[in-house]
């Protein structure tokens, strides 16, 4: 089961690769949080994390105006924000060729 609550662990790592491997090893990926003073490290980390929502230097990773949802076994699609409507749509392409007199 996926823990859903205020659970946090502190671990030390030697390399960023170790951090990413440890974070991405789980089948659940609702949210991830990164705390750093380095913008370079921020970009290197968030681009490799497999999570639906990522907070950087904050625990507030989503607002009502932004899409929210998990990755992997933590969910499918997004809720919130104007882009979320796409997850509720079933897009269909219809190519119709009718003779002129059929109109």
Please give the residue ranges for each predicted region:
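Conserved C-terminal structural/oligomerization subdomain of aldehyde/semialdehyde dehydrogenase
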Residues: 1-103
């Amino acid at each position: 089961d996926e823990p859903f609550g205020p659970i946090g662990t502190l671990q030390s790592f030697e390399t960023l690769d170790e951090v990413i491997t440890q974070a991405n090893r789980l089948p659940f990926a609702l949210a991830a949080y990164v705390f750093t003073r380095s913008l370079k490290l921020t970009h290197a980390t968030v681009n490799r994390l497999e999570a639906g929502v990522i907070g950087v230097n904050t625990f507030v990773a989503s607002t009502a105006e932004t899409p929210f949802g998990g990755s992997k076994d933590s969910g499918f699609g997004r809720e919130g924000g104007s882009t979320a409507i796409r997850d509720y749509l079933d897009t269909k392409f219809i190519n119709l060729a009718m003779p002129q007199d059929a109109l």
